Amino acid sequence: MFKFTAQQHVYDINGVKVGGQPGEYPTVLIGSIFYRGHKIVSDGQKGIFDKDAAKALLDQEAELSAETGNPFIIDVLGESVEALTKYVEFILENTTAPFLLDSISPDVRVGALKNLGKDPEIQKRLIYNSIEEHYTEEELAAIKEAGLKTAVILAFSKKALKPNARIDLLQGKDDKEGLIAAAKRAGIEQFLVDPGVLDVASNSWTTEAINVVKEQFGYPGGCAPSNAVYLWKKMRSKGTPFFEVAGAAVFTYPITQGADFILYGPMMNAPWVYRAIATTDAMIAYNNKLTGVKMGTTEHPLLKIF
């Protein structure tokens, strides 16, 4: 394994540590809930859902985290302002975990942010997902008004697929403002950099970009290979356990190259994802007997899964 030469930023998001050298802290796992097509949601516009089923998913996540040592963040998705607001309120009441405020629509994210107000509890736990190349000044203003300090920075564009091009999105090029500078204008102080994943094969380019981000800037880096995995029709057609084994390889590869967090998709897949990630984390941490990097927590997979 290796050590990054840049000083690594380690953020504490309501008790969840993310960042650092390979093996220093466990990988943070981010599972999705209330996504489009999620069976526990009966009305995605009004935010009507099965609360018992949602609570069971949250409880399972907490149990797996306690078993493996991998901390978790909840990816809360919503199709409308009303729905996303209701989902966040449920999360606030039923877990102490940090969460991503997530929607494919920036208007939905901003609307929900305005509904939630400047609650100190929300400010500690809410991670804006995400600030990306098409951000608007209204969006940045809403983030600043809400007093948020943490955001996912999506350094991805179909015009910037190679790793170095994604770095240009982060730091800016010529007269184009970089995403980090834009995020700072919105009051963001903690940056979770996600270079984006186009498909399974190019997860290697994403991983290279994460490595460069950590080497040059020291920001926590990670990605969301889940969409690419679930769109992999040829492998999905083979069914379980073949799909899960292949998925585990896709999710763990970035970690071997320094990634700090993984968005793994639907929370129902947590049982196999946690075990795969924890095993990888343990091996990396053991190798640090050679690199000299000390574990930053006693709640580490190396100390829990064997």
UniProtKB/Swiss-Prot annotation:
Domain of life: Bacteria
Reactions catalysed according to its record: methyl-Co(III)-[glycine betaine-specific corrinoid protein] + (6S)-5,6,7,8-tetrahydrofolate = Co(I)-[glycine betaine-specific corrinoid protein] + (6S)-5-methyl-5,6,7,8-tetrahydrofolate + H(+)
Record-level GO BP terms: methylation; one-carbon metabolic process
Entry keyword Transferase: yes
Molecular function as annotated in GO: methyltransferase activity
One Pfam family cited in the UniProt record for this chain: MtrH
Enzyme class: transferase
Keywords associated with the record: Methyltransferase, One-carbon metabolism, Transferase
InterPro entries attached to this UniProt entry: Dihydropteroate_synth-like_sf, MeTrfase_MtrH/MtxH
EC number from the UniProt entry: 2.1.1.378
Transmembrane feature ranges: none
Function: Methyltransferase able to catalyze the transfer of a methyl group from methylcobalamin (methylCbl) to tetrahydrofolate (THF) in vitro, to generate methyl-THF and cob(I)alamin. In vivo, the methyl group probably comes from the adjacently encoded methylated corrinoid protein DSY3155. The methyl group may then be ultimately converted to carbon dioxide, and its oxidation would also provide reducing equivalents for anaerobic respiration. Thus, may function in the pathway that allows anaerobic methylotrophic growth of D.hafniense using glycine betaine.
Similarity field: Belongs to the MtrH family.
Protein name in the entry: [methyl-Co(III) glycine betaine-specific corrinoid protein]--tetrahydrofolate methyltransferase
Gene source species: Desulfitobacterium hafniense (strain Y51)
